[in-house]
Swiss-Prot record:
<comment type="function">
    <text>Catalyzes the reversible conversion of 2-phosphoglycerate (2-PG) into phosphoenolpyruvate (PEP). It is essential for the degradation of carbohydrates via glycolysis.</text>
</comment>
<keyword id="KW-0456">Lyase</keyword>
<feature type="binding site">
    <location>
        <position position="386"/>
    </location>
    <ligand>
        <name>(2R)-2-phosphoglycerate</name>
    </ligand>
</feature>
<comment type="similarity">
    <text>Belongs to the enolase family.</text>
</comment>
<dbReference type="Pfam" id="PF03952">
    <property type="entry name" value="Enolase_N"/>
</dbReference>
<dbReference type="InterPro" id="IPR000941">
    <property type="entry name" value="Enolase"/>
</dbReference>
<feature type="binding site">
    <location>
        <position position="364"/>
    </location>
    <ligand>
        <name>(2R)-2-phosphoglycerate</name>
    </ligand>
</feature>
<dbReference type="GO" id="GO:0009986">
    <property type="term" value="C:cell surface"/>
</dbReference>
<dbReference type="GO" id="GO:0000287">
    <property type="term" value="F:magnesium ion binding"/>
</dbReference>
<feature type="active site" description="Proton acceptor">
    <location>
        <position position="335"/>
    </location>
</feature>
<dbReference type="Pfam" id="PF00113">
    <property type="entry name" value="Enolase_C"/>
</dbReference>
<feature type="active site" description="Proton donor">
    <location>
        <position position="204"/>
    </location>
</feature>
<feature type="binding site">
    <location>
        <position position="283"/>
    </location>
    <ligand>
        <name>Mg(2+)</name>
    </ligand>
</feature>
<feature type="binding site">
    <location>
        <position position="365"/>
    </location>
    <ligand>
        <name>(2R)-2-phosphoglycerate</name>
    </ligand>
</feature>
<keyword id="KW-0479">Metal-binding</keyword>
<keyword id="KW-0324">Glycolysis</keyword>
<dbReference type="GO" id="GO:0006096">
    <property type="term" value="P:glycolytic process"/>
</dbReference>
């Protein structure tokens, strides 16, 4: 037995200088752990609700109410429970909140407690978190989907697509993939300088130049890959997070690159991109409630590119089930704070995998030094992780943790590589 004995919480700052919640858990055997909660810039309407204070303090973004919720309601609800009974702990959290969207106590309060309990239980068991959650067979290191050029809500530029990523699919190990990604990142900086473009950074560590549009951004990254001597499409592939909900309006459709477009016109644009560039994955290409558009797009290009539901699914098993039934998307983005407990996150991943959907573990734009998602990526065998550029310590912390996990696994470690993208078949 590893009984939860004490639960504490505090307000800390995330990578954007905004407050977030950190929760600490002490077990009766002396095991101790903490977890910090991330926060998004572009958030889906269907996400679980963060509890913020409002008012003048921290421009309304304080989380003292969420901290108080942990101390006054969550702690009494879970103290005395065996920390290794994660599903029981998380059900106690859900019962304490009592709302479908976690709006009373806040998903940020619930998630902090849920993850801290899991980390404490792993500590008590003498296991690394990835092994504790994933069991004896957890051994696959994910492909890092490195956001090296930022636009949309992550940068103050005119680029509508939110993230342009490189995926080192041809590397033999995670260690090699990280090196390749870092080399492309630095090569991109050189390319931008040569062309007189800005090299300031966006929220997630990627460069944020004000370029003309999607194709120019992809061309710049292609040049950067070439500079390193790596082969585009074989060693390194490309990926996008469009975050289309951010530029969709009822009545006018998608205001994208200077014109209003329909879902069909957006689909035609993506089909053109997939034929012209080695793109393995497109996230949120359409609005979070445009089910018909998603289904049509999946029918059109889902056989040759990964279509990832982020705002569409918000890591919610019920939303994902709806997508599976309708045939919308073919992959799930996994963000623990979208749903608010570890158990619900694992349930969503399990549902995705059982139905042939790929999964990509993901950070948020507002991150901390917490490395939980690195362990979870290996634990669930997602084969893909999105946690920003190979720069800024809150991003690099996750990559460095994956290096440690790969080293820990030794000869048992396997890098997912191109196998993570079975639909990818770029012909150039």
């Amino acid at each position: 037995m590893s009984i939860i004995e004490q639960v504490g919480a505090r307000e800390i700052l995330d990578s954007r200088g905004n407050p977030t919640v950190e929760v600490e858990v002490l077990l009766d055997d002396g095991s101790f752990a903490r977890a910090a909660v991330p926060s998004g810039a572009s958030t889906g309407e269907h996400e679980a609700v963060e509890l913020r204070d409002g008012g003048d303090r921290y421009n309304g973004k304080g989380v003292e109410k969420a901290v108080e919720a942990v101390l006054s309601e969550i702690a009494p609800a879970i103290i005395g429970i065996d920390a290794t009974e994660q599903r029981t702990v998380d059900q106690a959290l859900l019962d304490a909140d009592g709302t479908p969207d976690k709006s009373r106590l806040g998903a940020n309060a619930l998630l902090g407690a849920s993850l801290a309990v899991a980390r404490a239980a792993a500590e008590s068991s003498g296991l690394d978190l990835f092994r504790y959650v994933g069991g004896p067979n957890a051994h696959v290191l994910p492909v890092p989907m490195m956001n090296i050029l930022n636009g949309g809500a992550h940068a103050d530029t005119g680029v509508d697509v939110q993230e342009f990523m490189v995926a080192p699919i041809g590397a033999a190990t995670f260690k090699e993939s990280l090196r390749w990604g870092a080399e492309v990142y630095h090569a991109l900086k050189s390319v931008l300088k040569e062309k007189g473009l800005a090299t300031g950074l966006g929220d997630e560590g990627g460069f944020a130049p004000d370029v003309a549009g999607t194709k120019e951004a992809l061309d710049l990254i292609s040049l950067a890959v070439g500079k390193t001597g790596l082969v585009l499409g074989t060693d390194v592939a490309l990926a996008l997070d469009v975050a289309a909900t951010e530029f969709y309006t009822d009545g006018t459709g998608y205001k994208f690159e200077g014109s209003n477009r329909t879902a069909d016109e957006m689909a035609a644009f993506y089909a053109e991109l997939v034929d012209a560039y080695p793109i393995v994955s497109i996230e949120d290409p359409l609005d979070e409630d445009d089910w018909d558009g998603w289904v049509a797009l999946t029918d059109q290009i889902g056989n040759k590119v990964q279509l990832v539901g982020d705002d569409l699914f918000v890591t919610n098993p019920e939303r994902l089930e709806e997508g599976i039934v309708k045939g919308a998307a073919n992959a799930l983005l996994v963000k623990v704070n979208q749903i608010g407990t570890l158990t619900e996150t694992l349930d969503a991943v399990d549902l995705a995998h059982r139905n042939g959907y790929k999964t990509m573990m993901s950070h948020r734009s507002g991150e901390t030094e917490d490395t939980t998602i690195a362990d979870l990526a290996v634990a669930v065998g997602s084969g893909q992780i999105k946690t920003g550029a190979p720069a800024r310590s809150e991003r690099v912390a996750k990559y460095n943790q994956l290096l440690r996990i790969e080293e820990n696994l030794g000869d048992a470690a396997r890098y997912a590589g191109e196998v993570a993208f079975p639909r990818f078949a770029f012909e150039g």
